[in-house]
Design a protein with these regions (language model features):
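Short, residue-level hotspots on alpha-helical faces of the histone-fold
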Residues: 102, 106, 131-136
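Helix-centered, glycine/charged polyanion-binding patches within enzymatic domains
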Residues: 40-41, 46-122, 126
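Polybasic low-complexity intrinsically disordered regions
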Residues: 1-59, 129-135, 143
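Intrinsically disordered, low-complexity and often Lys/Arg-enriched segments
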Residues: 145-149
Length: 149
């Protein structure tokens, strides 16, 4: 199997970086390759908890300027009410992070990419890179249409 890790722009939602790896690898192990050193804000799901404490992120010269906004695990929010401040903060983080999920939805639903076709990550990565480039064109076109309306 194969996993795709994607970094997107937080305003438009276009893909800025994509990293591929085996499916049995943890999400946080590919985070250093995914996030450039000049990034100021990092949003991620619960699989990236503790990313800011890892050694490879603390050695950057921009590390003190970077803020990590990682969603909590679902079990932490289980007993809280809907009006709770922590739940509202998590909702805001998720609303920014959903731009990545839109990329995955576009690749899977519009471009019908559900299974890896080739043997090896490199061949599948070339195919997905082409799909992500098309996805960026679609996303930017939608963004321009929203601006013009």
């Amino acid at each position: 199997g194969m996993k795709m890790h994607v970094a997107t722009d937080d305003i438009i939602g276009i893909v800025t970086n994509a990293v591929y790896g085996p499916a049995n690898e943890h999400d946080i192990s590919r985070a250093r390759e995914l996030i450039p050193s000049e990034t100021e804000q990092v949003y991620g799901d619960a699989g990236y908890v503790g990313m800011g404490k890892r050694e490879e992120f603390q050695t950057d010269k921009e590390a003190e300027k970077r803020s990590y906004r990682i969603n909590l695990r679902p079990g932490v929010l289980k007993g809280r009410s809907a009006e709770d401040l922590i739940r509202k903060i998590e909702h805001f983080k998720s609303s920014v992070r959903c731009k990545v999920e839109h990329v995955f939805a576009r690749v899977k639903l519009q471009m019908s990419y559900r299974k890896t076709r080739y043997r090896g990550i490199a061949k599948n990565a070339h195919r997905i890179n082409t799909m992500l480039a098309l996805c960026n064109l679609f996303t930017f076109d939608c963004y321009l249409k929203r601006l013009m309306a």
